A protein has these predicted regions:
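N-terminal small-domain helix-loop-helix segment of the aminotransferase-like
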Residues: 8-97, 104, 278, 347, ...
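Conserved PLP cofactor-binding pocket of PLP-dependent enzymes
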Residues: 27, 203, 342-365
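Conserved core of the PLP fold type I
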Residues: 59-194, 205-223, 293, 322
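Active-site PLP attachment segment
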Residues: 206, 219-252, 264-267
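Structural signature of PLP-dependent enzymes
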Residues: 253-258, 278-302, 330
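Conserved glycine-rich beta-strand-loop-beta hairpin in the small C-terminal domain of fold type I
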Residues: 291-301, 313-326
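Short, conserved charged micro-motifs
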Residues: 331-337, 374-378
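PLP-dependent enzyme catalytic core of the Aspartate aminotransferase-like
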Residues: 343, 358-390
Length: 390
């Protein structure tokens, strides 16, 4: 058997494994956080690709700088409050998805055996990347207001010293929670006091339809590295993400990216930039995304509460892509329900997939992003036939 220690540490993603199952046409998937196919801006992407190949074929098809396509870096810098900085793009590294950004910054800032703190439950991809890097994980409790910063402070007071604290501050994956304004201020103060880096993984921040967004962590402390992506607001198949970081951190990540893949696809970088920078495109497209996902979220939550309200609690999302449902039967194990659910034609992700130290057996992550209303109804009907009645 060919298997390194890194492979053993990382393990296989439960969600990626489920995607093989959900490709079967008879399965209604509430598992993956995939954009709704109807929202993919194929015409705009086609225009951008054609323009890149016509206007700059050499730049689109030749090797490029590891840091990324400079116009895209400038655009990202502007979106992150650096528009007035003439060298704002120096803070930006374009990566092959934000997943690569997390992998690079972990290797750049944490040696194997170092400590990274994160919420429990946590995003599966982050768990894979961190475990593959050989770091130790400090599991911090979380609730409806995000990471429990007081619990982190207690750990720090005992002498624990994480190099990184990883958060999905806006519409966490899997819980859907948003880190409250008060906790953001407290977390930033802890970073300044103890010297750790905050990694704010932010693929969902633009998908808000209710309420005001709290102040970004990057505006509260310079010890913030923000990860972003074109996957949720444009198309995941383009595999373009980015990190916005202090220049010395960006340079360290660039050195590691050189040995990883030289640079992210020059063509897809141009496609992303030309599409997102097209006047009026992003504003209009975000309206479409928010309207679509709000309607689908409300539909799924309503169906679950109507048909399964005696068996689970279902929060109302303000944005993002996920519902973190909780089974009322405290002895239930959602992992044991997955196979019967798939056999019935519906897929979800059990809470155990997101566990750092806890298994979250009564939790289920349900995505409303991909399926239409009729499919969501069918999925709920099938779940109702699998989850035991009280």
């Amino acid at each position: 058997m060919v298997k390194s220690l890194a492979v053993e540490r990382a393990g296989s993603s439960a969600i990626r494994d489920l995607l093989e199952i959900t490709e079967q046409p008879e399965i209604v998937s509430l598992a993956g956080g995939l954009p709704n196919p109807a929202t993919l801006p194929t015409d705009a992407i086609a225009r951008a690709a054609a323009a890149a190949l016509e206007d700059d074929p050499l730049g689109a098809l030749q090797y490029g700088p590891t840091e990324g396509y400079r116009p895209l870096r400038r655009w990202v810098a502007g979106r992150h409050g650096l528009a007035a900085d003439p060298h704002g793009e120096e803070h930006v590294l374009v990566t092959s998805g934000s997943q690569q950004a997390l992998e690079l910054l972990t290797r750049a800032l944490v040696d194997p055996g170092g400590l990274v703190a994160l919420a429990d439950p946590a995003y599966v991809g982050a768990l894979q990347a961190l475990r593959a890097a050989g770091v130790d994980l400090a599991a911090i409790p979380a609730d409806g207001d995000g990471l429990c910063v007081d619990a982190l402070a207690d750990r720090l007071a005992t002498g624990e010293r994480p190099a990184l604290v990883y958060v999905v501050a806006n519409f966490d994956n899997p819980s859907g929670s948003t880190l409250s304004a008060e906790r953001r201020v407290a977390l930033a103060a802890l970073a300044d006091r103890y010297g750790f880096w905050i990694v704010d993984d932010d693929p969902y921040g633009d998908l808000r339809w209710h309420g005001e967004a709290p102040v970004p962590l990057r505006e509260l402390t310079d010890r913030t590295i923000t990860l972003g992506s074109a996957s949720k607001v444009l198309a995941p198949g383009l595999r373009v993400g980015w990190a916005v970081a202090p220049v010395e951190v960006r340079r360290a990540m660039t050195t590691l990216k050189q040995s990883a893949d030289l640079h992210t696809s020059a063509l897809t970088q141009q496609i992303v930039h030309r599409t997102l920078a097209e006047p009026g495109f992003l504003e209009g497209h975000l309206v479409t995304l928010r309207t679509t996902y709000q309607a689908q979220a409300e539909h799924l939550v309503g169906a679950l509460r109507t048909k399964l309200g005696d068996r689970m609690t279902v929060p109302e999302p303000d944005g993002g892509m996920f519902v973190w449902a909780e089974l009322l039967d405290t002895t239930a194990d959602s992992a044991q329900l997955l196979d019967p659910a798939v056999a019935a034609g519906v897929a979800f992700v059990p809470g155990a997939a997101f566990g750092v130290e806890r298994l979250h057996p009564t939790r289920m992550r349900l995505s409303y992003a991909t399926a239409d209303a009729a499919s969501l109804d069918l999925a709920v009907d099938r779940l109702a036939g699998v989850i035991p009645a009280p």
